[in-house]
């Protein structure tokens, strides 16, 4: 399954979560799209549909294809320490595009992915163009010298509140780092990862 490229606001309303991170989609229309969306409540879902919806919420939040998402889920299951769902969250958050987003170098995850793809981002001084690159705590994430005047980057940094507890960022140098692995309570409070584990366990 390919990465979703359709209307994000409509999808946000269908899933009941802000995929942009701004919350504007749900503030304006806090109901599902369609003729029967504005009824004041969402229809009751089956157990399978609830699990699928939770999986889709997380997958679309990080903008991954089903194959990328499932492979990362399987990788998380091979980590011996910790819970499967929590480890899955950590792997999602330590992707290079996620760290670039958390540092405030991009205003959205798709924008962060584009910065990485186009070679604007360095890891420990070396250009990395793979959004799924796994960042380790202490690695320095910076902007390539010739890219430091790119307007979207500067605008994102200026607008960023930079309140992510597991990263540090120097706005003057346009560089930062993942200081430690995130704790579960610092991530996705509106996501129930146990439902995602149940979904994939059901598939076998």
Swiss-Prot record:
Species this protein is from: Oenococcus oeni (strain ATCC BAA-331 / PSU-1)
> One of this protein's GO BP terms?
ribosomal small subunit biogenesis
Description of how the protein assembles with itself and partners:
Part of the 30S ribosomal subunit. Contacts protein S5. The interaction surface between S4 and S5 is involved in control of translational fidelity.
Annotated GO molecular function terms are: rRNA binding; structural constituent of ribosome
InterPro entries reported for this sequence: Ribosomal_uS4, Ribosomal_uS4_bac-type, Ribosomal_uS4_CS, Ribosomal_uS4_N, S4_RNA-bd, S4_RNA-bd_sf
Instruction: Give the keywords, sorted.
Output: Ribonucleoprotein, Ribosomal protein, RNA-binding, rRNA-binding
Q: Which family does it belong to?
A: Belongs to the universal ribosomal protein uS4 family.
Q: Which SMART domains match?
A: Ribosomal_S4, S4
Protein function: One of the primary rRNA binding proteins, it binds directly to 16S rRNA where it nucleates assembly of the body of the 30S subunit. With S5 and S12 plays an important role in translational accuracy.
> Which Pfam families does the record cross-reference, listed alphabetically?
Ribosomal_S4, S4
User: NCBIfam families this protein is in?
Assistant: PRK05327.1, rpsD_bact
Q: List, alphabetically, the Gene3D superfamilies matched.
A: Ribosomal Protein S4 Delta 41, Chain A, domain 1, RNA-binding S4 domain
Which SUPFAM superfamilies does the entry link to? Alpha-L RNA-binding motif
Record-given protein name: Small ribosomal subunit protein uS4
Query: For the S4 RNA-binding domain, which residue ranges apply?
Result: 94-154
Question: What are the record's GO terms for cellular component?
Answer: small ribosomal subunit
Region Disordered, residue ranges: 22-43
